[in-house]
Amino acid sequence: MTQILPIRFQEHLQLTNVGINQASVSFNTLTMESDKFICVREKVGESSQVVIIDLNDPTNPIRRPISADSAIMNPASKVIALKGKAGTEGTAAAQKTLQIFNIEMKSKMKAHTMTDDVIFWKWISPNTLALVTETSVFHWSMEGDSQPIKMFDRHSSLNGCQIINYRTDPKHTWLLLIGISAQQNRVVGAMQLYSVERKCSQPIEGHAASFAQFKMEGNAEPSTLFCFAVRTVQGGKLHIIEVGQPPAGNQPFTKKAVDVFFPAEAQNDFPVAMQVSAKYDVIYLITKYGYIHLYDIETATCIYMNRISGDTIFVTAPHETSGGIIGVNRKGQVLSVSVEEDNIIPYINTVLQNPDLALRIAVRNNLAGAEDLFVRKFNMLFQNGQYAEAAKVAANAPKGILRTPQTIQQFQQVPTPAGQTSPLLQYFGILLDQGQLNKYESLELCRPVLQQGRKQLLEKWLKEEKLECSEELGDLVKQADPT
């Protein structure tokens, strides 16, 4: 029997098949700011070109005769940022002149000349560019005629590093600069974490990182998590930490630190890229040697690890449509990895033999594949008289698998201790908090409520669209109140 896989691996495109020269597929000449566009700088004969590949229409690349030192496409629209301009190659101005063009309108939107060379830059949102110089980091908004604003000075721990990435949380209150350098026959990762509110930096040893928003069970607001992976002399680690003060009323996230496994034959391997899937609350970690690691963000459990590319994947972005990660390797393959929805829960349950994690992820992401686990848990709690817990399991089980007439009948048969809420009403209470009741649930909830003469409750639920209207419900209301 072939083993089920919890991931889906896809090759979207081979860049050499759409006219891209293999020599142009590198960190210095190819950029991918999102899953929408790939941008390549190429020399064709004597002329310099910028090639834009729309990943929704990859067989029709747009070629423009542009001479630039660097080119990055906006993550959302056909807007391109160019560094250096014709005639500045090799001059002091090459790294300082920044221009933003709207490709469709064929118009220049903004331009700015920096005092210092920009050695790394990145779109951090559809309307903001981050600019990194040897000494500082700036944010440049596309709004109006605003100038780049200095966010922070670089920490000395990044001196002499090649800057490979820059990340922010969604509100741009936490900023992170990542660099690497060769030391004692290994690649060392150096990061600078900066808090805009506190105006202070923390140097951290790390190779790849990402921020994530994660809503813990029972919390009203999502927690802002900082996830980073590192390979030190001692070994590999993944850390997941909540940054800043937890939002009011939230339980704090317990920080996690787990080992990142590197096989014996990958002595010099290290993490190079990380993306967090908001869709599945998982971390995708990619290493220099082309291994993918998949972690659950809540528990930091490693769900899966395998080699997906024999060549280094040197640029990645979130793959929005699948909740996955997309990347380009040195060979010019455009690859993506995402969660295989139908397989991940059975895989965690049977291959990892971790039913608790299977239940958690199934509930969190409304995924099928753990039906028998939910039925077993519900029956066990019910038999133990833990009706409130059983009600929670029945209400939260994915795809409504336990929201059946049988479940309601089971709760109806349980005697209610004097002065306490009946288990049936506890069950309906949880369902009402979550959204609309189905036809059968609506009838069975309204029956005892109308018998108690509490018609105003029913009117409230109808107004809030919590009940599914049906002929039978109408008849029930008429019987209780013929007026």
Where are these regions (language model features)?
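PEST-like, low-complexity acidic/proline-rich intrinsically disordered segments
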Residues: 1-13
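Extended alpha-helical assembly domains of large eukaryotic scaffold proteins
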Residues: 9, 16-483
